[in-house]
């Protein structure tokens, strides 16, 4: 589809509401104003007018806002019609607008895409619009707004600028090898490179925090039947999310709860008790449990404290530990401390965290909450922080790898040409975050996930 088309879409959620907004962007927006309103409203003033059908009869009446380009969200001529939020009224008005030549329904995210293409915002800011709409906590919303206002982009642009200056110095050292001063070995390039790498590490740390705020952490509760997994899910959720009985195998399917711990989103997943089951339904539930474990960020290995005194997971259930994905973090949770009389708290056993608690009474659950937050390195004090997506983390990691390789070339062989190439690739990776260097395919994937009216 052409970006020269004039597009229209509903900017408010579907369904009934007090107000419904249609947004039009493109060269034909002024034609829509003349046809539907009978005039072109004064720029950036709210004008209360009837919205007319083809024969001149009013379909609705409401507020019209006219934003001539380039001083608009998309950088194009933009008209907003704010009428009553009934779906029938909005549909009639939309059909009326589409009778005009040169107009079509907008694709998902096309308004934001046009704003990006017209340099009204960069790619990270465009993504922040969707993240702000989808924010699941106050802290996530504040961080998304910071990204929209350019906090993340400013950090990335600072790194790109520093790399540009460093590349200029390295290129000079390559182009003028006969100078008396050996630029590659005078220590200045290494010092500047170390400074850029330190700044990049700081941005990566903040980006990981931002990614946690946006994506959350997936925690799977796993263990044998009747270990108290569903009771723990209820304790963490603060409500009766799962049925709890003394009958082994009560939970036969995956149960999911979305909670927040001091602003960090957490996806808690309760699974069927793991055992050799004869029942077909239970077997399916157990297979699904293993599928969830394979995708988890952390596993809470639930142990009935009344059945064993062991604390090492490899001793408690070696077959379970052997089947877990390599490097998957495990927290051993010894449950039923109210029965065994074990001291509540957290300790370390052979590289694994061990927590003693009672899911039934809730004693020790707060220790587990703090452990989950700290195990992911989540910082509740993120004033001025920003949200980050997985593609941002990948780009930052790629840039860091290129800088590491460039430093190795500098110190190992004083190879200026190879260092210059690694610096270029690092700069290119960072530029993908803001969209300075981005493929059309990536743009399509990003904006297709947006709302229609955005």
Swiss-Prot record:
GO terms for cellular component: cytosol. GO terms for biological process: tRNA methylation; tRNA wobble uridine modification. Its cofactor is K(+). GTP binds at residues 226-231, 245-251, 270-273, 335-338, 358-360. Residues 216-377 form the TrmE-type G domain. It is found in: Cytoplasm. K(+) binds at residues 226, 245, 247, 250. Its main location: cytoplasm. (6S)-5-formyl-5,6,7,8-tetrahydrofolate binds at residues 23, 80, 120, 454. It comes from the Bacteria. The keyword ATP-binding does not apply. Its EC number is 3.6.-.-. NCBIfam families: mnmE_trmE_thdF, PRK05291.1-3, small_GTP. PANTHER family: TRNA MODIFICATION GTPASE GTPBP3, TRNA MODIFICATION GTPASE GTPBP3, MITOCHONDRIAL. Homodimer. Heterotetramer of two MnmE and two MnmG subunits. This is tRNA modification GTPase MnmE. It comes from Klebsiella pneumoniae subsp. pneumoniae (strain ATCC 700721 / MGH 78578).
């Amino acid at each position: 589809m052409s970006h020269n088309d004039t597009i229209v879409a509903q900017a408010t959620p579907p369904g009934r509401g007090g107000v419904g907004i249609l947004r039009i962007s493109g060269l034909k927006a002024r034609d829509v104003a003349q046809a539907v309103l009978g005039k072109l409203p004064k720029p950036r003033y709210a004008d209360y007018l009837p919205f007319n059908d083809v024969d001149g009869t009013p379909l609705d009446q409401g507020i019209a806002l006219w934003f001539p380009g380039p001083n608009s969200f998309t950088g194009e001529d933009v008209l907003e019609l704010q009428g009553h939020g009934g779906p029938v009224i909005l549909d009639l008005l939309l059909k009326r607008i589409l009778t005009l030549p040169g107009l079509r329904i907008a694709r998902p995210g096309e308004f934001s895409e046009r704003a990006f293409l017209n340099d009204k915002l960069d790619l990270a800011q465009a993504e922040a619009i969707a993240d702000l709409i989808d924010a699941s906590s106050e802290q996530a919303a504040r961080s998304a707004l910071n990204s929209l206002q350019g906090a993340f982009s400013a950090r990335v642009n600072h790194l790109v600028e520093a790399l540009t200056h460093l590349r200029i110095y390295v290129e000079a050292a390559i182009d003028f090898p006969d100078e008396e001063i050996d630029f590659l070995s005078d220590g200045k390039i290494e010092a500047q490179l170390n400074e850029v790498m330190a700044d990049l590490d700081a941005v990566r740390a903040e980006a990981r925090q931002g990614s946690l705020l946006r994506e959350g952490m997936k925690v799977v509760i796993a263990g044998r039947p009747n270990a108290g997994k569903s009771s723990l899910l209820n304790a963490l959720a603060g409500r009766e999310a799962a049925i709890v009985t003394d009958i082994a195998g009560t939970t036969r399917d995956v149960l999911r709860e979305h909670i927040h711990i001091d602003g960090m989103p957490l996806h808690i997943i309760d699974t069927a008790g793991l055992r050799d089951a004869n029942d077909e339904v239970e077997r399916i539930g157990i297979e699904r449990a293993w599928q969830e474990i394979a995708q988890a960020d952390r596993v809470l290995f639930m142990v009935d404290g009344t059945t064993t005194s062991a604390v090492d997971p490899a001793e408690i259930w070696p077959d379970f530990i052997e089947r877990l994905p390599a490097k998957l973090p495990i927290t051993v949770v010894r449950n039923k401390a109210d029965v065994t009389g074990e001291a509540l708290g957290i300790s370390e056993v052979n590289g694994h965290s061990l927590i003693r608690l009672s899911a039934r009474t809730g004693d020790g659950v707060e220790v587990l909450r703090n452990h989950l937050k700290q195990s992911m390195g989540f910082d509740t004090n993120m004033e001025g922080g920003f949200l980050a997506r997985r593609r941002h983390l990948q780009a930052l990691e790629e840039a860091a790898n290129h800088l590491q390789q460039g430093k190795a070339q500098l110190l190992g062989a004083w190879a200026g040409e190879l260092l210059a190439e690694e610096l270029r690739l690092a700069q290119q990776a960072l530029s993908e975050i803001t969209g300075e260097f981005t493929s059309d395919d990536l743009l399509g994937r990003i904006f297709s996930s947006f709302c229609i009216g955005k």
